[in-house]
């Protein structure tokens, strides 16, 4: 399973990836808007939006690309490790 995490804190990117590995998920983390962002998303199983620390432009770009590719979008207001872990538990359970 693969996920794209959009938002969160720059300094926690590595920790987000480590938690995803714990649930056997490959992860890409985008904490800021990057050039050719839409191309870099790829085709993950889910896009997780950590909405409290992310620009509106990045959220809109991620949502638009996910809708275009029919990818599940999960919004989470918090960007803590425990909240990400809860989201991953729900994804793995389904």
Cite the ranges covered by each PLM segment.
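Short glycine-/small-residue-rich Rossmann-like dinucleotide-binding loops
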Residues: 52-53
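Catalytic phosphate/metal-binding cores of nucleic-acid and nucleotide-processing enzymes, i.e., regions
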Residues: 8-10, 41-43, 90-94
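Long, contiguous binding/interaction regions
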Residues: 2, 11, 57, 86-90
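Short, charged N-terminal beta->alpha structural module
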Residues: 1-24
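Ser/Thr/Gly-rich flexible loops in soluble cytosolic domains mediating phosphotransfer, phosphorylation
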Residues: 67-94
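A short, well-structured beta->alpha microelement
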Residues: 25-40
